[in-house]
């Protein structure tokens, strides 16, 4: 693997052995008391994860060389247009929901108000109003095969997201640096044993099924375009993964997140409409 400007050097024969993924979500609690249906679904997920490791088309590194994904360069070219739309969104930054406002299971790793979100797509479900507000960003992410989630991820000053593992290894994650304050050594993301630094207009692609943590120890806000997309897999894992991704939306914790976002979206845009229609002085 060639070295990405955002990733740590690839391991050599003198470095630690290749990393191994563990199974099962760590750090994020899907449900306190999962139903029998949810327990059954999670047992299938564990089986699917073992298939995904075995049949991965591009291997299972914690951090990928972005050149492996030709479309990543196209997304980087869209940075100016995406950044311009983000600036408009940030005019109402204080009104944006925290991640745990939308997905309550995230409360196990984030309870403050320093991680805000602006979803365009969550688990394959569109936020039509947010897409309307950011058409260029939406057009850009359409270039990503297997897109499942797209949002602005906003780390306010002092935010530190503790070590955790994502819920499922059937997707990969892209971060496109949009606002990356200085000094660079005060903010980063660690994926397994690799510490990566964001750069504005540059993509970072990693597997969040490895333990990872992120921090912003500067006095300014950091923003990335946060995207999940389907991991390239060979058969039979590809078919199992497709089925699970389509069934996941019916699980209680994902349905709850989608409902929470709909409620926030309704309120957010109702307030904007009321402001536009206010009596003129």
UniProtKB/Swiss-Prot annotation:
Coiled coil: none annotated. One of its GO terms (cellular component) is membrane. Disruption phenotype: Partial deletion of this gene causes serious deficiencies in nodule development, nodulation competitiveness and nitrogen fixation on Phaseolus vulgaris plants. Mutation affects the membrane lipid composition, particularly ornithine lipids. Mutant is deficient in OL hydroxylation and is more susceptible to acid and temperature stress. Mutation causes an increase in nodule number that is reverted by the deletion of olsE. Pathway: Lipid metabolism. Residues 1-24 have a biased composition (Polar residues). InterPro entries: Asp/Arg/Pro-Hydrxlase, Asp/Asn_beta-hydroxylase, IPNS-like_sf. The keyword Electron transport does not apply. Involved in the biosynthesis of ornithine lipids (OLs), which are phosphorus-free membrane lipids. Catalyzes the hydroxylation at the 2 position of the secondary fatty acid of OL. Contributes to symbiotic performance and acid tolerance. Belongs to the aspartyl/asparaginyl beta-hydroxylase family. This is Ornithine lipid ester-linked acyl 2-hydroxylase. The lineage of its organism: Bacteria, Pseudomonadati, Pseudomonadota, Alphaproteobacteria, Hyphomicrobiales. The gene is olsC.
């Amino acid at each position: 693997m060639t070295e990405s400007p955002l990733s740590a050097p690839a391991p050599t024969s003198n470095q630690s052995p290749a990393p191994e993924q563990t199974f099962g979500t760590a750090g994020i609690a899907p449900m306190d008391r999962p139903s029998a249906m949810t327990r059954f679904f999670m047992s299938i997920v564990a089986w699917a994860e073992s298939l995904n490791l075995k049949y991965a088309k591009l291997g299972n590194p914690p951090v990928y060389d972005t050149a492996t994904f030709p479309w990543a360069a196209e997304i980087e070219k869209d940075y100016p247009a995406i950044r311009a739309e983000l600036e408009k969104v940030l005019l109402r930054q204080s009104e944006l929901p925290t991640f745990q406002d939308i997905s309550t299971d995230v409360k196990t790793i984030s309870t403050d108000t320093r991680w805000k979100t602006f979803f365009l797509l969550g688990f394959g479900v569109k936020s039509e109003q947010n897409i309307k507000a950011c058409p260029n960003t939406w057009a850009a992410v359409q270039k990503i095969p297997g897109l499942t989630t797209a949002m602005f991820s906003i780390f306010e000053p002092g935010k530190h997201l503790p070590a955790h593992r994502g819920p499922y290894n059937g997707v990969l994650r892209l971060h496109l640096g949009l606002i990356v304050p200085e000094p660079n050594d005060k903010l980063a993301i660690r994926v397994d044993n690799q510490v990566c630094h964001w750069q504005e207009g540059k993509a970072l692609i990693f597997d969040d099924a490895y333990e990872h943590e992120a921090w912003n120890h500067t006095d300014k806000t950091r923003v990335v375009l946060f995207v999940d997309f389907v991991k390239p897999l060979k058969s039979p894992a590809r078919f199992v993964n497709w089925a699970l991704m389509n069934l996941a939306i019916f699980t209680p914790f994902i349905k709850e997140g989608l409902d929470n976002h709909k409620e926030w979206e309704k309120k957010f845009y109702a307030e904007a409409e009321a402001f536009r229609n206010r009596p003129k002085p």
